[in-house]
């Protein structure tokens, strides 16, 4: 079968090779020959011989039929071959196509897989894109909201800057304006757009521009902030003083872009300061004027009384003259304290060191001190440790002032016994004075306080402060330090005190200060309501009160006291604080609620803790506080405070007002000031003080909050000077305490002083206004 296929293939290939015609002719010829051969073979077999007709017939028959049959067959074969070839080609193409399809199928699968991956990636990317779009929308919304907020904040900041009365401006590195607020526009008369790119010389006067440029250069040169004051002109010609602060401006990477400036109008502050300085100068001028006017008659009284003491006198005349002499010297030295205090405030105390006859100095000191001691029945001893120099170089007046102050205090606080002054001179040119007394002594907790300005030691029972200005020891110690020495003190309560004065003296000396003048005027007989629940305290208080000529009714409870009290029936009510049913504070509040203030007598608290609770008692409506156990000196002083014994008909209200005024105001200075310059200058100064005080108090509080000790002291000094210039003694004393950080426990107490200043200054001003109005009517 295989060979047949090969033979057929050979047949077809030959036909295709020779062509249809030639192959047909060749095949026909071959068939004719074959037919002849077969015919001859058959004839030979059948007949045994071959005739020519047989051959011709075979040739003819073969030539007639074979070509057509061969041609037809060849055509068929050719067509079949062509069909086969076409089929072969088609098969080949199909194979190629199949292979290509297979390849494409593989590629398609790969592409499908890749496409699936791409689709997955695209779907993921699409999801991420959608998420990003969502986040972007949120971010866009947030940015829009932030932009709106920024615009609102920018608008608010701009409105805030424009609403500020302070100047705000910016200048770049070329010293050109980059922006400003509304206040700056008003100052320059130009809008912000007009100011941009202008330089100071284009905006200010030549003098002002020069200072502006100078300060700008300092800021740029040193890269530090700068604060200064400068007067600038408004377009209408009005001048204003500004406190200007300039700071370099940096971006977030630390690159400087220019400076920012702020300016606050302090014109009014300047005016107030100038007014206060003028008032202070007026006060100094006033003190200087009356210094001469008072010293002349005082010196005459002292000199003439001393001369008269050397003449023949009766015992009574000598006693009176000694009183006049000591009182005049005391008054003069108290005035010296006031003068020195004023000088120390202005830092103008100067020492006049001259040769001093020390022997005569001690003799004069002994004579004068002995006179003062005799007034109270005391012994005076001068114990010099020899040898002493005959002359020393010092300010004799100042040394005498210090010693007189120490001796006067020793006599003042000694009821019986003696006062001893010891003097010695050591190597190193130091003079030592010891002033020892046998008086009441000083509590240990007050030893460090007695040298503070205005501090006054309480009496022996811890009640009312002893009389005096409270400035003598403070002035004396400052003077001693100026003279190269100091004053120290040792004391034992109930046994006496010893003050030691040292000064540097190749030849040195100083004067005495401050004396004491007891007021022995008779006291009025009062009807007293004593509210006390402890029987022993009742006995002590009743005995003291009746000893002074008073009649006493006793209430043991608060309820009984309220029932017993009737307006006009009692001249004085003494209230114990701790009662069985209520406190003395409750009684005071109830009485002030029931009755008008003018119908109430003085309400005085009895307590064992005056210093801690006094302000609380005063706030509850009480008029004063006495310490228990009740003492004659304290009670006497309190009665003198509320009653003018020379005019028993004067109303209690007036007496209370006067006593309060004396505690709050510098009455002598105000009276003399009123007589010399009239009320207008006082009221003008007071008006200035009222304007300045809120600012002072605010600064004080802020400095206290910031614990700025220097700032507190500076503001305290300002307040002290301002209050003193208008006669507000209480505020002046508070200012003195606030400005004196060397006072004992200053840091613990300064907050309370500032709070007291804040709470009381308006009340003190009203008291002064009322006093001026009343004094003017007189």
From Swiss-Prot:
Keywords: ATP-binding, Cell inner membrane, Cell membrane, Kinase, Membrane, Nucleotide-binding, Phosphoprotein, Transcription, Transcription regulation, Transferase, Transmembrane, Transmembrane helix, Two-component regulatory system. It is an enzyme of class 2 (transferase). Residues 678-771 form the HPt domain. Activation requires a sequential transfer of a phosphate group from a His in the primary transmitter domain, to an Asp in the receiver domain and to a His in the secondary transmitter domain. It is a multi-pass membrane protein. One of its GO terms (cellular component) is plasma membrane. CDD domains: HATPase_EvgS-ArcB-TorS-like, HisKA, HPT, PAS, REC_hyHK_CKI1_RcsC-like. It catalyses: ATP + protein L-histidine = ADP + protein N-phospho-L-histidine. The chain crosses the membrane at residues 26-46, 58-78. GO terms for biological process: regulation of DNA-templated transcription. Its main location: membrane. PANTHER family: OSMOSENSING HISTIDINE PROTEIN KINASE SLN1, TWO-COMPONENT HISTIDINE PROTEIN KINASE. This is Aerobic respiration control sensor protein ArcB. The gene is arcB.
């Amino acid at each position: 079968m295989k060979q047949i296929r090969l033979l057929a293939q050979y047949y077809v290939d030959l036909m295709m090779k020779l062509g249809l015609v030639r192959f047909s002719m060749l095949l026909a010829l071959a068939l004719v020959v074959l037919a002849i051969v077969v015919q001859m073979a058959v004839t030979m077999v059948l007949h045994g011989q071959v005739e020519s007709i047989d051959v011709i017939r075979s040739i003819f028959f073969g030539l007639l039929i074979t070509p057509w049959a061969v041609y037809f067959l060849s055509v068929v074969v050719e067509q079949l071959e062509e069909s086969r070839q076409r089929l072969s080609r088609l098969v080949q193409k199909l194979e190629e196509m199949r292979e290509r399809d297979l390849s494409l199928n593989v590629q398609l699968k790969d592409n499908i897989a890749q496409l699936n991956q791409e689709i997955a990636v695209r779907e993921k990317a699409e999801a991420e894109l959608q998420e990003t779009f969502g986040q972007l929308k949120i971010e866009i919304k947030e940015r829009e909201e932030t932009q709106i907020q920024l615009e609102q904040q920018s608008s608010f900041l701009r409105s805030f800057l424009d609403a500020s009365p302070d100047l705000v401006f910016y200048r770049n590195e070329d010293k050109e304006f980059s922006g400003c607020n509304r206040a700056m526009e008003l100052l320059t008369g130009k809008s912000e757009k007009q100011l941009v790119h202008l330089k100071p010389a284009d905006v200010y006067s030549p003098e002002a521009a020069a200072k502006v440029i100078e300060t700008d250069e300092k800021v740029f040169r040193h890269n530090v902030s700068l604060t200064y004051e400068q007067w600038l002109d408004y377009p209408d010609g009005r001048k204003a003083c500004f406190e200007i602060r300039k700071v370099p401006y940096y971006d977030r990477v630390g690159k400087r872009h220019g400076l920012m400036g702020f300016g606050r109008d302090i014109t009014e502050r300047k005016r107030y300061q100038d007014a206060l300085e003028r008032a202070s100068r007026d006060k100094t001028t006033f003190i200087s004027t009356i210094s001469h006017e008072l010293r002349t008659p005082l010196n005459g009284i002292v000199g003439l009384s001393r001369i008269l003491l050397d003449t023949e006198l009766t015992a009574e005349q000598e006693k009176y003259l000694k009183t006049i002499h000591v009182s005049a010297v005391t008054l003069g030295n108290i005035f010296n304290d006031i003068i020195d205090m004023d000088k120390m405030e202005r830092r103008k105390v100067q020492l006049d060191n001259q040769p001093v006859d020390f022997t005569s100095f001690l003799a004069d000191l002994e004579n004068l001190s002995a006179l003062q001691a005799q007034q109270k029945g005391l012994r005076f001893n001068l114990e010099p440790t020899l040898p002493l120099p005959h002359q020393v170089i010092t300010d004799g007046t100042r040394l005498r002032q210090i010693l007189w102050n120490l001796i006067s205090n020793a006599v003042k606080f000694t009821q019986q016994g003696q006062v001893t002054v010891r003097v010695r001179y050591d190597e190193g040119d130091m003079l030592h004075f010891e002033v020892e007394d046998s008086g009441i002594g000083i509590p240990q907790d007050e030893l460090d306080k007695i040298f503070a300005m205005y501090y006054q030691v309480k009496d022996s029972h811890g009640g009312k402060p002893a009389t005096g200005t409270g400035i003598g020891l403070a002035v004396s110690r400052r003077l001693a330090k100026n003279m190269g020495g100091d004053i120290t003190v040792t004391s034992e309560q109930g046994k006496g005190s010893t003050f030691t004065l040292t000064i540097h003296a190749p030849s040195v000396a100083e004067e005495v200060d401050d004396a004491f003048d007891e007021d022995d005027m008779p006291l009025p007989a009062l009807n007293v309501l004593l509210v006390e629940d402890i029987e022993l305290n009742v006995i002590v208080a009743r005995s003291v009160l009746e000893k002074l000529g008073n009649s006493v009714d006793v209430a043991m409870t608060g309820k009984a006291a309220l029932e017993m009290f009737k307006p006009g029936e009692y001249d004085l009510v003494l209230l114990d604080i701790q009662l069985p049913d209520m406190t003395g504070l409750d009684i005071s509040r109830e009485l002030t609620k029931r009755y008008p203030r003018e119908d109430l007598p003085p309400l005085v608290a009895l307590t064992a803790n005056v210093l801690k609770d006094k302000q609380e008692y005063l706030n509850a409506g009480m008029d004063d506080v006495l310490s228990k156990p009740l003492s004659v000196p304290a009670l006497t002083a309190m009665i003198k405070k509320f009653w003018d014994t020379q005019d028993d008909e004067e109303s209690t209200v007036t007496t209370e007002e006067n006593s309060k005024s004396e505690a709050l105001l510098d009455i002598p200075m105000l009276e003399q000031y009123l007589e010399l310059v009239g009320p207008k200058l006082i009221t003008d100064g007071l008006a200035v003080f009222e304007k300045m005080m809120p600012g002072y108090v605010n600064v004080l509080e802020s400095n206290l909050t910031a614990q700025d000790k220097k700032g507190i002291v500076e503001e305290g000094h300002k307040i002290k000077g301002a209050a003193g210039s208008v006669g507000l003694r209480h505020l002046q004393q508070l200012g003195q305490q606030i400005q004196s950080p060397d006072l004992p426990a200053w840091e613990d107490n300064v907050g309370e002083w500032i709070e007291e200043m804040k709470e009381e200054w308006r009340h003190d001003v009203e008291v002064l206004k009322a006093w001026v109005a009343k004094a003017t009517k007189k």
